[in-house]
Amino acid sequence: METGLQFLMQKRNKNNSSKKIEIHQFKSNFFIGSESDFKLFNLKSFSKDDLNTENVTIIHFNKPPVIVPNKLFIKDNLNKYLSTNYELSNNLSVSYDETTNKLIYIVYEKKNNLETILNKKGIEFMSINYFTVIYEYLTPLKKNDEMSIYINIRNRLFDIIIYNKDEFLYFNTFNKKNKEEFLYYLLYVLKNFQADVNSTKINFLGKFEEFKEYYDYTSLYAELVYIKNNTQTINNIKHESPFFLNSII
């Protein structure tokens, strides 16, 4: 098993002809699939036959990561970075990813149970945090606005990512119970960056039927843009972060 984006780029070059399989690991379950064809699993229902490829990537969604600039990153301080945000879990391990542009490190907690099973079965895989995937997807995109706001809506949470032209500025994750709470946090962040919601475009990662009321509510205050899924998509398997059904790595 290896971690980090450098290994991801190597695997892309070496395994272009082999089928890529992604495992999206959440707190209580995980999804296995590729190219928008994913299935829900738990540890009891999982078998080696579900991974008939050598090109496997585990994407971890357990907890929001901590972003550390390259110049400030010290490997011995991994636990310290996370403990400033939340209490560390005894049953989770701490890992990190380095972005391909080497500007930031993504530090995060992850479950080891699935990785242990794959190692015992002799299945090679790479392991990466979900924000690393989003960062690597968004950073190369052409950004015409002075400030670009991206939102990844999830089941009970949402992520906000902000760029100043091509420079990454901000990432945070917020809980949400309803569209009003969602808009409150969004406006709070925009205010902190002195962004005018009436003139700032909000870029949603994907467009999914289950979040329609969030789109409609936000559209009352700002212009919306949908990244990747221009037409409304139904999340039939109740994926907790449906934008990742696009297999964007």
Model-identified regions with their sequence ranges:
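Hydrophobic/aromatic-enriched cytosolic interaction surfaces used to assemble or bind macromolecules
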Residues: 1-249
